[in-house]
Amino acid sequence: MAIERTFSIIKPNAVAKNVIGSIFARFEAAGFRIVGTRMLHLTVEQARGFYAEHDGKPFFDGLVEFMTSGPIVVSVLESENAVQRHRDLLGATNPANALAGTLRADYADSFTENGTHGSDSLESAQREIAFFFGEGEVCPRTR
């Protein structure tokens, strides 16, 4: 199977809980290689741009407000079948439906403040990675 890349966000509520290291440890324990990461505080313009596909939906303004409420950690993860495996590790978008042992079951506070984001397809992963990382900012791991 081919190695894929996926995109991950640790959202403001999870950052505030001081669980970044725990989440990274779970990524690595699940076989992901972290090949790019940074912490930043999104501007309203960045959040609106990143979530543009949801503009006009009832939850959009609340999502933008939440995503700009504190720092986030964005990462690029690499593994076989990375997109699906990462989504499985995150759990259901609605934490009420997330299986025990998933990141959202452990760190989410609500549907909007669900602790984490993961790409839903390879195409989304490529677009989301390019939104936050420029050329040379993702480091392939050969060892």
Swiss-Prot record:
The active site is at 117 (pros-phosphohistidine intermediate). InterPro entries: NDK-like_dom (IPR034907), NDK-like_dom_sf (IPR036850), Nucleoside_diP_kinase (IPR001564), Nucleoside_diP_kinase_AS (IPR023005). It catalyses: a 2'-deoxyribonucleoside 5'-diphosphate + ATP = a 2'-deoxyribonucleoside 5'-triphosphate + ADP; a ribonucleoside 5'-diphosphate + ATP = a ribonucleoside 5'-triphosphate + ADP. Its EC number is 2.7.4.6. Keywords: ATP-binding, Cytoplasm, Kinase, Magnesium, Metal-binding, Nucleotide metabolism, Nucleotide-binding, Phosphoprotein, Transferase. It holds the Pfam family NDK. One of its GO terms (cellular component) is cytoplasm. Its cofactor is Mg(2+). GO terms for biological process: CTP biosynthetic process; GTP biosynthetic process; UTP biosynthetic process. It comes from the Bacteria. ATP binds at residues 11, 59, 87, 93, 104, 114. It is an enzyme of class 2 (transferase). One of its GO terms (molecular function) is metal ion binding. It is found in: Cytoplasm. Belongs to the NDK family. Homotetramer. Major role in the synthesis of nucleoside triphosphates other than ATP. The ATP gamma phosphate is transferred to the NDP beta phosphate via a ping-pong mechanism, using a phosphorylated active-site intermediate. This is Nucleoside diphosphate kinase. The gene is ndk.
